[in-house]
Amino acid sequence: TVKTNKRTISADEFFKGLFTTALQDGEIITAVSFPVAAKAGYAKFPHPASRFALTGVFVAKTAGGDVRVTATGASQNGVMRVPGIEAALKANWSAGAIDGVKVPADGLLNDIHGSSGYRANLIKVMAQRAVAAV
């Protein structure tokens, strides 16, 4: 949750795209809050030269059982949630639970570093690695 000098915005509503947020003129972020994760992990597949994430995935599970999975470096819109993997991990927090999940390639980057299909697969693999590391 993002708190500003004027309002409170959920993270899903705050991030509008790559380098774009829901902030209005004169609005300043005053606080950011999020539930403490009981389990969390991050794995990235770095670009060999820059070391930036070609695809990076963060997985988190709260004590109450809520699960969030986000990917960076793969989407045309910046950070994205991965609902299919979230649902699989909510049912069974294990790397194997992700095996049957198909991550859609729609909206993913397609460039000289990797096709959108390749990035969709990387999201899945990095999510499995992040869960396995917890």
Predicted features, each with a name:
Residues 1-134:
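C-terminal structural segment of proteins
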